Amino acid sequence: ARMPKPIFQNNDLISLMNDNIKLLQELDNSINIKFVNSDQKILFNCDKEQLSRVFFNLIKNSIESIHQKSEKVTNFKKNISIELNQTDEHINLIIDDTGVGFNNLDTDIKNILNPYFTTKQKGTGLGLSIVNKIINDHNGNIEFVSKNEGAKIKIIFSK
């Protein structure tokens, strides 16, 4: 999958994230999405469409993961928590969910970025590899953190 070259412009990541959350909650309002941010605005020189795709894909993965878990586990809090903040040099994004998590992967967590690697019945395995490419093109780094309940994803962009 070839990505078009990013077109960099100054965009507000807070409103970009809010747009994606709103869209995903219209598609599925059974999950509580909490968005915490320290600033009114976080401006970042980025390709708006591409970063929007990253936000959308990652939150959608969290939603699907929570649904997957709810097929087996009945009583748990269906939460996604998203945090966006900045320092002088970096912008940090943390997405934390209560879904199935990464602990039950039969493989190394690093493999989830490989093209065509998928754990979904109808997955193509391209979602996260595209997400990773976009993040790299934006001077960023993605990290997958295992935790007991659910998954945590950290992305750090250099300004």
Predicted regions and their residues:
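Short conserved segment of the HATPase_c
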Residues: 102-115
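Conserved micro-motifs of the catalytic ATP-binding
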Residues: 3-6, 43-46, 119
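Short alpha-helical Gxxx[C/S/T] motif in the catalytic ATP-binding
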Residues: 127, 131
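Conserved glycine-rich
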Residues: 140-141
